[in-house]
C-alpha cells in the first residue's frame, strides 16, 4: 500500500496525459497542419498560434538552452559512474541515481515513440523549409521539464548549503520555464504540444520521486512526529 501511495501522483498524472492524448485524436481534428495534416483541438491551436506568431530569435535561444539538458544528464551519469567505480558494485550505487538513469531512458523511449508515430506535425513557420516534423508532445518541453525537475530533487537531497541549493533550484526552474514558454512563443509548436509535454514530464518526474524517495521521506516524517 505504501509503495502504491508513493507512485500514485505519477500514475494519476500519466492517466491525465493518456486521456489528453486520446482527445487529441478525436476532438476538433482539422487538416490545418503543415501539408494539410490533421490537428486535434484545431480551433484552439490555430487561434493561439496566430495570436503569438513566430520568432526565430526565441527559437534559437530555446535551442541553446536545450543543450543544457544533456549537460545535466551527463553530470548525473558521471556521478553514477564515479560511484560504480569507487564502490565496485552496481548494487552499491545510490538508488536515486539508478532510478534516475532509468527515468532518462524512459523519457528517451517516449521521445522515440512519438517521433516514429507522430500524432501531429509542427505548425508552419518562416525558417522551416517545408519538412514535416513530429510535434506532439514538445520534446524540448518533455526533456527540459523532466530533467530540471529531477535535478531540483537531486539538489534538495545532495546539497546542504541553503543558499546554493536555492540558487541552483531557481536556475533549473527558470531554464525549464523559459524553454517551455519559448517553444510556444517561437511558433514552432502548437499549444497542445506544450501541454502534452508538461503533463508527460510531470508524470515521469512524480513517478521518479515516488520510486526514488517516496517511502524514505514518509518514514523520516513519521519518525520526526
Label every model-predicted segment.
Residues 1, 86-95, 219-225:
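Membrane-interfacial, low-structure loops and terminal tails that flank and connect transmembrane helices
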Residues 32-34, 84-166:
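Membrane-interface loops
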Residues 76-86:
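Long, hydrophobic/aromatic-enriched structural stretches that serve as scaffold segments
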Residues 4-10, 24-25, 127-225:
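Membrane-embedded catalytic cores of phosphoryl/pyrophosphoryl-handling enzymes
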Residues 8-19, 98-113, 117, 146, ...:
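Hydrophobic, lipid-facing residues on alpha-helical transmembrane segments of integral membrane proteins
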Residues 16, 68, 72-78, 102, ...:
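Lipid-exposed faces of alpha-helical membrane segments in multi-pass integral membrane proteins
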Residues 3-7, 60, 64, 89, ...:
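Hydrophobic, aromatic-rich alpha-helical transmembrane segments
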Residues 1-73, 116-128:
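N-terminal transmembrane-helix/juxtamembrane module of multi-pass inner/ER membrane proteins
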Amino acid at each position: 500500500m505504501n509503495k502504491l501511495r508513493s507512485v500514485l501522483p505519477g500514475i494519476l498524472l500519466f492517466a491525465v496525459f493518456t486521456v489528453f492524448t486520446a482527445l487529441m485524436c478525436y476532438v476538433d481534428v482539422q487538416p490545418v497542419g503543415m501539408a494539410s495534416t490533421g490537428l486535434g483541438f484545431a480551433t484552439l491551436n490555430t487561434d493561439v498560434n496566430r495570436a503569438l506568431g513566430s520568432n526565430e530569435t526565441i527559437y534559437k535561444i530555446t535551442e541553446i538552452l536545450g543543450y543544457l539538458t544533456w549537460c545535466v544528464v551527463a553530470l548525473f551519469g558521471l556521478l553514477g559512474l564515479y560511484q560504480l567505480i569507487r564502490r565496485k558494485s552496481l548494487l552499491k550505487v545510490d538508488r536515486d541515481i539508478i532510478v534516475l538513469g532509468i527515468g532518462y531512458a524512459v523519457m528517451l523511449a517516449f521521445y522515440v515513440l512519438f517521433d516514429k508515430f507522430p500524432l501531429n506535425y509542427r505548425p508552419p513557420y518562416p525558417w522551416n523549409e517545408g519538412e514535416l516534423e513530429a510535434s506532439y508532445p514538445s520534446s524540448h518541453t518533455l526533456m527540459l521539464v523532466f530533467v530540471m525537475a529531477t535535478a531540483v530533487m537531486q539538489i534538495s537531497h545532495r546539497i546542504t548549503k541553503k543558499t546554493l541549493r536555492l540558487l541552483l533550484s531557481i536556475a533549473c526552474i527558470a531554464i525549464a520555464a523559459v524553454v517551455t514558454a519559448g517553444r510556444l512563443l517561437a511558433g514552432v509548436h502548437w499549444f497542445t504540444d506544450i501541454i502534452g509535454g508538461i503533463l508527460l514530464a510531470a508524470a515521469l518526474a512524480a513517478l521518479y520521486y515516488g520510486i526514488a524517495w517516496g517511502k524514505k521521506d514518509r518514514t523520516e516524517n513519521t519518525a520526526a512526529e
